[in-house]
Amino acid sequence: MNLKFYNLIFFISFLICCIHGQRYLPVEGGKCEKYIGDGDSGKRICNGYLANPDSVYVHNKTQQETLKDLRSLINLLELNNPSKECINPSNYKIMCAMMFPECIEINGTNIVKPITLPIYTCNSFCKEALVTCSVPNTIASCDGGTNLPIQLPYTPIEWVKYNLTIYGGVDDYRVNCTDPTLISDSGSSSEIEVGCVEPLIKRPTNDTKGDLEKGYFYVNSQCVINCPVTGMHPKSVWNQIFKINDVLSSISLACTLILLFTFGILNPKLNRFDKKNLFFIAGVFGMSVSGVLIAANGSEKTVCPTPERYAVNTDRVCVASGFLVHFSALFAILWWTIGLADVYYGIKFVGKKIKIKVRYYLLATLTISLAFTLVPLGTGQYQAGLSNVMCFLKDEIYQSMTFFVPLGICLTMGTILMILVMREIYVIVKSNSTSSSFSSSSSKSKSKSKSSDSISYLKLQVKPMLNIILFYFTFLYLFLFVRVINSRYQEYEDSAIPYMLCLAKGGGDSCRLKGPSAGSLGYFAYCLRIYGIYLFIISFLSSRTIKIWKESIILNNAFVTPIIKFIDSSFSNRFSSSKNTSTTQNSTLNNTESDTSKRGNSSAVSINLESRNYNTDDDDL
């Protein structure tokens, strides 16, 4: 019974010791030093907030290293909660007392050598500071934790004890913890100014939600993220991406203008194919114009009107470019789908056309494109955002419903039609091979003629198919890029805490937020602006285009015609043969002319077929 009673007494005593924070600590062998001051950072830290600046305890770090850690801790508090409830003299005293504890020196007749000990800050005040600054215990804790991003000094609950017998002292020397809030301010009770660590920009506000609508992205009530986000990519990388966007937009604009002028104005007779192609080119032209609008206004200035603000629906150039690229992209993808359907129908039924007037296609494409763009325009959706190189739809729901759903439908239809086209090509080629191998002489001629027409028509569809495939893969990338970015949004958002910790520790420009890679952003700009150049290479560099220009008034007038004849004559004289050519050379020349004549006849047949394809399917708009 007595044994149980003593055990109970021992347990209660142990519990009381734990509650009051009794703990034996080893003598670390530190030293007392005078506080060196806050340094030349221009920001006040501990001057006036220490109980005894003439004697602070220094152990395993220099004061400069400790001061750096303290700055990181204060930066963290300011980033997390820059309000007066957190950033105030009381919390500064607590932080300074924790990092630079007062030092006491123990001497005595029995003490072998002087002993230096710290006066720790009480645990309750440490916790109070973290609570008022809303610091989560996953970042820093007053109860210790070796795996936390911010390591805080030890804070006892009430007191600590030391065993000083090896120094000639007592075995239970007690040192009470201190209450830093009782430290005299020494005339330093003025309000503390909150700063922002680079590259964040200071812009105090009482309405972060309202200012977000104006284009300011706050990390707290005092600091905004800079624009463009140098925490995601260095400024030089952003400039390169902007330059890609500007250059490709300008070249694409010039290319599509030439195509519109060639097939819309110089072309003596517009056929059904030309009309559809012109509307498709017009869509690509609009996409190029949106890029040139941004370039003319300054890409960075358009996306970032000021270094601390992103463009929103009150910035006219941003809204105009966003609306135009949205409308034009939808308009182009719709005509792309129509063109692909025509190619499939023409290959399936060799040279036949879908009997729908172009005017009805135009009415449908305009209606759909306007319906999906006027709604976002009316709700103020066109604006720039974090990690963007252009102005587009802000909310994911609008992105999905007014752009990516119709784009996805068109791409799905395009995928199906392309598979069907490939199947028809396979059938034609296989049929041609089979008929040439197994047909009788009488039927073989008819079959061969039919297969020849199919193959010839198929050859005429090479460029339209190349056009369709290039457009398919560029828009497929745009579709997948934004889908992937949206799916990784939480991952990017989670990187904000490590980024803030890095900034708090003074990482500056070396700190990185997760986001789309520079390569993916650059390729996004490339895909969005390159298509006008693709169109020019495919459509302009053809025999038909050369014929249109040769027969146009631009090259057939009193001023230009003599110049062309002179150039032709100069080249003819330069490369003409010598009069004293040998018989062998003459023979070779005759053979060459004969071959040229044959090729000319072959070309004539090809031109006839091409002419039949383009000019026999006239259709009133």
Swiss-Prot record:
Keyword line: Disulfide bond, Glycoprotein, Membrane, Receptor, Signal, Transmembrane, Transmembrane helix
The name this protein goes by in its record? Frizzled and smoothened-like protein H
**What is one process in the GO biological process aspect for this record?**
cell surface receptor signaling pathway
Q: Which residues cross the membrane?
A: 247-267, 278-298, 319-339, 360-380, 401-421, 465-485, 521-541
Membrane topology annotation: Multi-pass membrane protein
List GO molecular-function terms, semicolon-separated.
transmembrane signaling receptor activity
Q: Which gene encodes it?
A: fslH
Please tell me whether the keyword Transcription regulation is annotated for this protein. Answer: no
Q: Which residues lie on this side of the membrane: Extracellular?
A: 22-246, 299-318, 381-400, 486-520
- Disulfide-linked positions: C32-C103, C46-C96
Which protein family is named in the record? Belongs to the G-protein coupled receptor Fz/Smo family.
Glycan attachment points: N60, N107, N163, N176, N206
Region Disordered, as annotated, extends over 575-603
Point to the regions of Low complexity compositional bias: 575-594
Q: Which domain of life is it from?
A: Eukaryota
Q: What induces or represses this gene? A: Up-regulated by P.aeruginosa, PAO1 strain and down-regulated by P.aeruginosa, PA14 strain infection.
InterPro entries in UniProt:
Frizzled_dom_sf, GPCR_2-like_7TM, GPCR_Fz/Smo-like
Q: Where in the cell is it found?
A: Membrane
Q: What sequence ranges are listed for the domain FZ?
A: 27-166
A cellular component term from Gene Ontology for this protein is: membrane
Please list which residues make up the signal peptide.
1-21
Q: Which residues lie on this side of the membrane: Cytoplasmic?
A: 268-277, 340-359, 422-464, 542-621
